[in-house]
Amino acid sequence: MVLSEPGLYPLAASSGVVSGSAIAGGAEKESLEDLKARILARKRNPPQGGNEADYERFGEGLSHVSQAWARRPDGGPGSLAIWFLNAEGEIPVQSEIDQYMDHLHSRRLLGLRDIQINAPVDVPLNITVDLDPDTVDLRERVTASIKAMLKERSRPGLPPKRPGLADDDFILSRSWISEAISTVVGEDSHVLALPAGDLTYSVGRMPLTVNVSFV
């Protein structure tokens, strides 16, 4: 480890050795696409003194949180429910949920009495594609494209935006999957056998595990 500006710390050694086990926390280097998505989300949802987007940002500022979704179950300022994925885009474990809870308690507004931090329920997504041309390389790139689309578009189903409204289910459009396949360079044509139609995910449920089969 080397100080980038030794002149700012005249009493500190300019270099040192740190073992890997002594370094904790942190996250992998952010990709340009993830940075772009975060900046656009900030522009679309400027800080508003404790709205749902603010609490999503509070969580996404943690090293072990990649995405978060907040909703006020009763439509008022007194309660908040949050679902999130860890840094790997996977279901968080209890210790990660506890860290998120502690972090939000340190930043919550006084009127917020009840906070629920939830792990989404993974509903595996099974996809069957008849691909032309059908090569190993094209299969791999099609699978990667589908997973990238889901990372960008998918979310858990959420409670109603306001009392009296229906639940805000997440609807995965079949056309999104077909589009993700069609955009892969080298794909000439395909038939999407499964899913046969749009898929609906209720509160707390979302597609994370993706199984792509080729016929």
Which residues does each PLM region occupy?
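Glycine-centered flexibility motif
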Residues: M1-L3, G25-L32, G76-G78, S106, ...
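Catalytic P-loop NTP-binding/switch module of NTPases
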Residues: M1-N45, G49-G50
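Intrinsic-disorder/low-complexity coil detector
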Residues: E5, Y9-A12, A119, V123, ...
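Conserved short beta-strand edge segments in small beta-sheet-based binding/regulatory domains
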Residues: G7-V18, L109-P120, H190
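Short N-terminal helix-initiation segments at or just after the protein's N-terminus
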Residues: L11-A12, G16-E30, H64-R72, R205-S213
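An aromatic-glycine-centered, glycine-rich loop/turn in mixed alpha/beta architecture
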Residues: T143-V215
